[in-house]
Amino acid sequence: MNKANSFNKEELIACGHGNLFGPNSPRLPVDNMLMIDRIITINDNGGEFGKGEIVAELDINPDLWFFGCHFISDPVMPGCLGLDAMWQLVGFYLGWEGAEGKGRALGVGEVKFTGQVLPGAKKVTYKLNIKRTIHRKLVMGIADAILEVDGRQIYSATDLKVGVFSDTSTF
């Protein structure tokens, strides 16, 4: 298992193909749905709750796929993509910890949007504070997160929940 403390884009894509933590580990999406370019830091003892943290980034440029369709003459990154990135990172964290199975977003306590990501922005930063992980019959991660654009916080989410399942056929 790869217990590195940072990951580049190629390694994140490898995770999407089951080649980073193993073929049975939770996978990131690939191509357009991968909303992360790099993980700057990941650990299991830092963060606000002392149970782990992740800091990751997405480079912004006007050619990103969503600016061309959301919305015509009013391009803005869909807020749901930033929220999905937070869930992606909770699932990645569980894989990094050694969980096996398929990751699924299970919910979120509260989400607030107080700004927007526009084509002229340079960088989105995701900061997650792990609140709890469960590694029993149920495998689940819970985290609080914020999203910053060019250093300014514009989204927050509490109690992001991701589960890892050996069988999703009845989910």
Swiss-Prot record:
InterPro entries named in the record: FabA, FabA_FabZ, HotDog_dom_sf
Question: What processes in GO biological process is this protein linked to?
Answer: unsaturated fatty acid biosynthetic process
Report the Pfam families cross-referenced here.
Answer: FabA
Q: Which UniProt keywords apply?
A: Cytoplasm, Fatty acid biosynthesis, Fatty acid metabolism, Isomerase, Lipid biosynthesis, Lipid metabolism, Lyase
Q: Which reaction does it catalyse?
A: a (3R)-hydroxyacyl-[ACP] = a (2E)-enoyl-[ACP] + H2O; (3R)-hydroxydecanoyl-[ACP] = (2E)-decenoyl-[ACP] + H2O; (2E)-decenoyl-[ACP] = (3Z)-decenoyl-[ACP]
Q: Which residue positions are annotated as catalytic?
A: 70
Pathway annotation from the record: Lipid metabolism; fatty acid biosynthesis
Q: Which Gene3D superfamilies match?
A: Hotdog Thioesterase
An example Gene Ontology cellular component term from the record? cytoplasm
> Could you say which EC number(s) this protein's record lists?
4.2.1.59, 5.3.3.14
- Indicate where this protein is primarily found: cytoplasm
A molecular function (GO) term = trans-2-decenoyl-acyl-carrier-protein isomerase activity
State the superkingdom.
Bacteria
Q: Where in the cell is it found?
A: Cytoplasm
Q: Which family does it belong to?
A: Belongs to the thioester dehydratase family. FabA subfamily.
Q: How does it assemble?
A: Homodimer.
Function, please?
Necessary for the introduction of cis unsaturation into fatty acids. Catalyzes the dehydration of (3R)-3-hydroxydecanoyl-ACP to E-(2)-decenoyl-ACP and then its isomerization to Z-(3)-decenoyl-ACP. Can catalyze the dehydratase reaction for beta-hydroxyacyl-ACPs with saturated chain lengths up to 16:0, being most active on intermediate chain length.
Q: What PANTHER family does the record tag this protein with? A: 3-HYDROXYACYL-[ACYL-CARRIER-PROTEIN] DEHYDRATASE (PTHR30272), 3-HYDROXYDECANOYL-[ACYL-CARRIER-PROTEIN] DEHYDRATASE (PTHR30272:SF8)
Protein name in the entry? 3-hydroxydecanoyl-[acyl-carrier-protein] dehydratase
The uppermost taxa in this organism's lineage are: Bacteria, Pseudomonadati, Pseudomonadota, Gammaproteobacteria, Alteromonadales
Instruction: Give the gene symbol.
Output: fabA
